[in-house]
Amino acid sequence: MRFVIVTGLSGAGKTQAIRSLEDLGFFCVDNLPPTLIPKFAEACYQTEGKIKKIALVIDIRGGKFFDDLFESLKYLKEEGYKYEILFLDASDEVLIKRFKESRRKHPLSPDGRILNGISMERNRLREVKDRADNIINTSELATRELREAINEIYGEHDQIENQLIITVLSFGFKHGIPLDSDLVFDVRFLPNPYYIKELKQYSGKDKKVSDYVMSFDVTNKFVNRLEDMLDFLIPNYFKEGKRQLIISIGCTGGRHRSVAIANAIYEGLKSKGHKVNIDHRDINEDIHKGGKKL
């Protein structure tokens, strides 16, 4: 089990760090009191491997919390629990700028002087920083760059290319565009099997309908160009930190053309090693509602 304790200066990026760890599959808990760390660790280890990666954000500004944290860390070491400390740091100038931009009050500056609060917190956290296994200074890092730094330290690099989960979703425009779509493609320009008497009753999952849709030159040109575009977009989406991508493909009713095209795109992505799911949202919608045009 990998057990990471995340701490550091206020405004240095702890919230973004925990989000990045969550994207990497860590079970994350924010602001757990240090006294509860031993019991939490024991509970996680007793899951028999169901929880393999844990990250805790610990807020230890108060003096009593320091004693509690060091006692808890001592207990973990004595009991054989391995842990790592990730410390987030930043320069005074950058922290002041971030607090001013967010219009937040520093938690240790009751007099309103941000710099005084930062100085006090920096002194209190010095011993924790000295014990840290990894220190990330976020002064010059954008959100994406911090995420990349987290991935470099805590990511499973042999699996990183598969962390973007793709869903190819067919739908019918008459039933509404899926609200969670990232990309939407309209295939109503393709020849419609609905108007072919012997195909009307079938769906795009049936070979005879799929063969009909894919038999046209315009269909193959569209699929090829869409695949080329996805080959360009997917690695760039991942580079920017995206972990889920929903590609929605729509026709009129969501039963014939969109289903056939979605299946073609799904198979193409799958053959390239992507982690991809397929869903035909409206394939039976018109049958259930007694609709006509598909």
Swiss-Prot record:
ATP binds at residues 8-15. GO terms for molecular function: ATP binding; GTP binding. Pfam families: PapZ_C, RapZ-like_N. Keywords: ATP-binding, GTP-binding, Nucleotide-binding. GTP binds at residues 59-62. Displays ATPase and GTPase activities. Belongs to the RapZ-like family. This is Nucleotide-binding protein CLI_3561.
